């Protein structure tokens, strides 16, 4: 990330970053340390409050509570867009990314990571190992019943509109995130687009095993040097 921001500053003289869905600001710290001016948007009011408190004395961070997800459609130009585990929360993620690309200035970058691969392109082994790892993690958390109930609803294609776990994780409704379609949006307007597929799960032990033996479940995209 330091290298990313540094190269943008070298080309453009600054690096103004929009971080979509910043959570509690862990990644924001790295961006600021690298020399970026960061605007973070967060749909969750409690998370936005945590961010405001965390960066209350930092003039290089602006926090916006964006409950309706509309702030990303503003016209102001940007040097970089960062999306950490957030595209699968956006109903029309392709439309959102297409607009964000238009805001990125020449020489800028787009970076996203930790979104689930498009289900129709995944093997049965990939899906089954992913589901099994999730249930084992829930068991370790003492929440196996909750995990099983969520999985059963998803397998049946029936979703509880009152349940945040169902309705904020849009990828389970629309079968993941189409990484190839996103790559197709980025490729014509960036000089270099890298798609990385990898295994990812919540359990540290299962993560270590999966990195060695399991098929990919998740992806990241890194588009450099906007045309």
Place the predicted regions along the sequence by residue.
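Conserved alpha-helix/loop element of class I SAM-dependent methyltransferases that forms part
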Residues: 1-14
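Conserved class I S-adenosyl-L-methionine
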Residues: 13-23, 109-151
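Class I SAM-dependent methyltransferase SAM/SAH-binding core
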Residues: 24-70
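A conserved beta-strand element that flanks and buttresses the S-adenosyl-L-methionine
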Residues: 82
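A short glycine-rich, Lys/Arg-flanked "PGG" loop and its adjoining helix->strand segment in the class I
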Residues: 94-106
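Short alpha-helix
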Residues: 173-190, 195
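Core SAM-dependent methyltransferase catalytic element
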Residues: 189-191, 206-227
């Amino acid at each position: 990330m330091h290298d990313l921001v540094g190269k943008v500053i070298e080309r453009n003289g600054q690096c103004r970053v929009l971080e979509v869905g910043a959570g509690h600001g862990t990644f924001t710290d790295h961006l600021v340390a690298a020399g970026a001016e960061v605007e973070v948007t967060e749909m969750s009011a409690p998370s936005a409050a945590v961010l405001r408190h965390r960066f209350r004395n930092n003039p290089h961070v602006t926090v916006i509570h964006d409950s309706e997800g509309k702030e990303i459609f503003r016209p102001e130009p940007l040097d970089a867009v960062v999306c950490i585990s957030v595209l699968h929360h956006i109903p029309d993620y392709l439309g959102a990314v297409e607009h964000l690309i238009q805001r990125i200035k020449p020489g800028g970058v787009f970076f996203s990571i930790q979104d689930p691969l498009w289900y129709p392109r995944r093997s049965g082994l990939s899906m089954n190992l992913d589901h099994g790892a999730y249930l084992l993690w829930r068991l370790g958390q003492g929440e196996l019943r909750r995990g099983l109930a969520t999985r059963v609803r998803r397998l049946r294609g029936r979703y509880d509109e009152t349940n945040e776990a169902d309705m904020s994780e849009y990828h389970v409704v629309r079968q993941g995130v189409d990484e190839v379609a996103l790559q197709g949006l980025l490729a014509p307007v960036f000089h270099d687009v890298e798609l990385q597929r990898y295994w990812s799960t919540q359990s540290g032990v299962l993560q270590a095993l999966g990195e060695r033996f399991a098929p990919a479940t998740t992806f990241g995209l890194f588009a450099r040097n906007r045309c």
